[in-house]
Amino acid sequence: MNCKLTGFNTCIAAATLLLCSSPLVHAADNCAGVDVLVTQTSETTEIAKNHTISIWKAFSVLSSPDSIYNNTTGECSGVILTTPDGKTQSMGYCARKDKDGDTHSISWHSAPGADKGMWKSTGGTGKFAGKQNSGWFQFAVGDGKMAVTNWGGTCQ
């Protein structure tokens, strides 16, 4: 197996997986925003030609002016599988905190070849405690080191 660091492709795949949104709010959404992600590490192992698994970690800052998630910061990490047909699927977690020290975490995943991924709350403290929020995310733009994803969902 050939193990190497990758930049653009891994970040694109990972950012596609990670959450966040902007004014692309869907009808049922009552929260939305943008997640700005800065890659810390990315390592890809090529199992066979065009069949890879990548481990990715990034700093994350959410911007969502009308929700409790606005200006929460933290980290996201995940695993991205790319199959020989060129489709990717992924899963991972994000953990963030706000200026008051309250924390929240989410799990996220995207199905093989999907344009959008899904996220859901997994825990939190303070204002985030007991939340059962969930929604979608979609890659917007990236350059290999930084990425922006749009997100939306149903938030309590």
Language model: regions and residue ranges:
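Bacterial N-terminal signal peptides that target proteins for export
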Residues: 2-12
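N-terminal signal peptide c-region/cleavage motif recognized by signal peptidases
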Residues: 20-22
